[in-house]
Amino acid sequence: VELVKYDNKSDASEAFTLATKLMTSDGVVAVLGPATTGNFKAVIPVAEQNKIPVASGSATGDDVTVEFNEAGEVEYDENGKPTTLKEYAFRICFNDSFQGTAMAKFAANNLNATKAVVIADSSSDYGKGLAKAFVETFTEGGGTIVSEESYVAKDTDFSATITKLTGMDFDVIFIPGYYEEVGLIIKTARAQGIDCPILGADGFDSPELINLAGADALNNIYFCNHYSSLSEDPTVTSFIEAFKAEYNAEPDAFNALGYDLAKFVCDAIGRADELTGEAVKTALENTENFTGVTGSFTIDECHNPVKSLVVISLENGEQASATNVSLD
């Protein structure tokens, strides 16, 4: 397999241009990436037009592989196939709704929480989608949302929001957002005496979180992720050892997802009837029981992986435990 690499500079228009070049000039039979939801969605029309599959390791937006109707649901035909499926788009990561739902169940089932506060990033689809799924699942399970607060990306002062919460009665705080703001929110909450469990999603996963919040504040923290370095699974441990030997660094979830993505696509190329985009697409659709660093999965009818996630706990800023959570 020959690899052709380009840098989309985290820009949607650049991703579109490079995807076009890969498919029309370079003659590829599959494209890996882009990593983010917005950039990945930008290349899907190119994939559909040229009948070349694109697969992402980390685009978690719910509507990446299929469009939803006005009720927020996927419509199916009489054969059980989504009517608005993006035929040439695939991913190997779970989506935002899955994370929100899983963390709501974890709060109720593992932490015995019945009352929750949500502090969401209202400036991103990521934050809004996670918040919606968490609230729906938590309340459907009999829980109460005591308060829903919001912020926008780049905010730095959260004292007013946290002060408002100090007079309320709740068991957990769920913060669907990215580490840049999350670290400051946690730091402020702990400084004002709020010591309850604080929950989040894969946006927590960054070494910068400890720099922003401080190790002392990062206790009783739980967030879901695609994998944990605490795993004793031989597939995971061998990957970590090989990564450290090659790069002299600890691999994060994005490294693990990138590795699995390459293996996933190469596996499909090896199973394809011929080396064409259409044949590789069919092989990707027929993937069953693929074993990767981020877990084993089968591709479903919406081109999403059916897999579990890992809930990681932090104590003094370090990973203390990892719990596999499935929605089965």
Question: How does the language model describe each region?
Answer:
Residues 61, 186-259, 315, 319-326:
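Extracellular/periplasmic periplasmic-binding protein-like sensory domains
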Residues 9, 121-123, 227:
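Residue-level signal for short, function-critical loop segments
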Residues 1-2, 33-34, 115-121, 148, ...:
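Surface-exposed patches in mature extracellular/periplasmic domains of secreted proteins
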Residues 245-255, 266-319:
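Segments of small-molecule ligand-sensing domains
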